Amino acid sequence: MIHKVIEQWHAHMRGELANGLDLLLDDDVVFYSPIVYTPQAGKAITTLYLQAAGQTLPGEKKEGASSDPSKRFRYTKQVLDGNTAVLEFETTVDGKYVNGVDIITCNDAGKIVEFRVMIRPLQAINLVHQQMANMLEHMKPQSEQFHGA
């Protein structure tokens, strides 16, 4: 099952899967951020975080993204086993190298039930933290419903 989910995930990342997150994420998905200590539960909040990450760590389809392929978000390795995938990624943000992994677990229905992100090195974590905070603040009207503000 994970092979099909990851094929769909890659299609979503390329902008080729309409309503990709809605189709891929289980209603009760749990998102583990490298920045936020508390796991984020639910499709709506996970969608928000993944959309913010998509803006913070731009891929090839982003306007104004570097024409240098080595600076764009890209997956460099993947390991699929059972219902779990580990996808290693690299990118450059504001001249800083970012390396990390997405650990994705799906259920037997083909929905993502857990999404973990880990990032290195420390300067990348600090940069992504700052940019994610700015992006979430920009998305605040949408995010307030999730944080009870």
Describe each model-derived feature in a short phrase.
Residues 1-149:
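C-terminal and inter-domain tail/linker signature
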